[in-house]
Amino acid sequence: MAGSAAERSVAVPSIREAGCVYSVATRADEPALRELLRANSLGGWIQLAFQREPDAFAGTFGLAHSHDFIIAHEEKSGRAVGLCERFVRDAFVNGEVVRLPYLGSLRVNADFRNRIRILRQGFVAVRDLLGDRRDAGFSLTAITADNDVARRVLCAGVSGFPVYLPVGEMLTFAVRTRRSRVGASVCVAGREDLPAIAELLQRTYREYQFAPVWRGDELERLDATWLVIRDRRRIVACLALWDQSAVKQTVVCGYSRAVAVTRPLYNALAPLIRSPRLPAIGAPLRQIYLSHVAVTGSESHCQFDALMSAGLSIARERGLDVAVIGLAARNPLVEVVRRRWKTREYRSLLNVVQWPGRGQFIADSAGRVPHPEIALM
């Protein structure tokens, strides 16, 4: 079990303020991290808990330069109050490789919500207890668009909070899997193809903003199936089916009243309209990520269509109900998805988070489309 708040503040770097102790989470805090993630779902028309069973620290798949949580405990009782996650990966910013921090999993237990000072001090802990001089001076984060409370609080310019700078909108598509004929142009890649896939990803992702840098040895670590299209043996397009269920789970915790009432009828019609069913409360989504998308040339839309169709068919053969893919609203491939498949669409708002005097994000003049990998966020 984790020690008392007083013991924790001595053992690891920490900040004590207003009855709480904020510290860098250790292995002793790991059960509390998982409980905070289980107990605090994100609102909207569907409430989802993004869980990390069996190990909260495994969520970056060993791919990050650093991966930490700030955890807050009530000093008097030792109860866990909330958490914030920060990890750092190489990404393309203005065409250059930088060590980009990501902030996420901001959770506060219900008994402690609506206390601005807890959030304020949590951000102070992230700023002062985490980081490396080699990291970018700003971070990337996403806020669910229909989470009105989070959007109002975080983006309101509250004294002591970092600045949230809007940099784009992300769309997450949940697509019902279905069997179909896999196009002759698509094939499953082998391990020997991973260096070429990494080269393609680096070459294409450099043109985007906030796109991750992928190297061959990192691709080898993923539990993924790689689909590629070749032109005279050269890989010109790729997509991965990335199953994260052994490490990360998305669990339905509730629906809005209107959706809950109409859910039985909707689910009865879902197969007819080729839309994903809405799972029962408490059930994990049987999903897989369609990630690492790269298409090139004048045939890019056709390449993407063929890769997506093949991915959905393979996912259905594996008994998975839903495939998830994330694209910036400005990405031209969004229209391919909307035209070709019936989907559930979720909006989130990308923000750069920056503290005064710690570095500032300034976009270059290239008008780059954001392309963070939602499977990592």
What are the functions of these language-model segments?
Residues 58-60, 69, 88-94, 127-128, ...:
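Catalytic micro-motifs at enzyme active sites that drive phosphoryl/nucleotidyl and oxygen chemistry
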Residues 108, 113-130, 300-313:
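Conserved acetyl-CoA-binding loop-helix of GNAT-fold acetyltransferases
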Residues 110-112, 120-227, 237, 243:
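Contiguous mid-protein beta-loop-alpha structural module that forms a pocket-lining wall or clamp
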Residues 2-13, 141-183, 237-377:
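Active-site/acyl-donor-binding loops of N-acyltransferases
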Residues 2-65, 69-73, 80, 102, ...:
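Short amphipathic alpha-helix that is part of the acyltransferase structural core
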Residues 75-79, 85-94, 104, 241-247, ...:
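Acetyl-CoA-dependent GNAT
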Residues 67-84, 223-252:
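Conserved beta-hairpin
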